[in-house]
Amino acid sequence: MSVQAQKFNFEDYVYPFGCRTYASPDNKGNLWSVTQYSFESQAYDNYLVEEVYIGHGMMSAKSKYRYHTEENAVISDVQLRQNRLTGSTKYQDKLILFAFPEKDKPFKWTETDRGDKYQCTSEYVYINASIDHNSLFLKSIKMTRDNSYIVENEKHRFIETSYWVSNYGRLITFVDWDGTKKASSKLDVLDYIQEISEEEYNKMKK
């Protein structure tokens, strides 16, 4: 691996403004919940981040993540989830929150999240997005987590796709269950997003 997450200012992608708000729609497109992320500390290579989950206007969970950088990746060492109803649960899985692609090819890895194995990819793509009513053509990092599993002799597939842009952070996350795709979490000021070709991007940037 040739890219260093610290060297390339991963903060510009992860939490560029220190605090971000994401909206999660329900099946009808209505607002279901809001999640807010904020830095609690930014000591070198040791970042403590708090996540507050608000559903139906009430805080229902609070999580704390400690991140460190390792080669291409920003890694979450520990999750501490404080649930309003059930108390605290601690997960020890080491998960990659964000990773830079290699210079000329995707960066791929495998990770285990609470017993489920995911095949993951980080790659550069181009997008057209409207952010706060401004139409922009941007180079983005697309991260994909892919998990196949079998339940009662039936094969299922879960794919999570997120788009990250420097100085904006994570724009949106899509989830695809067995071919049914929907947005699960999006930046509150994101109006729309679509992936475009490099040729179209170069044409519109001229």
Report residues per predicted region.
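Conserved functional acidic sites
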Residues: 6-206
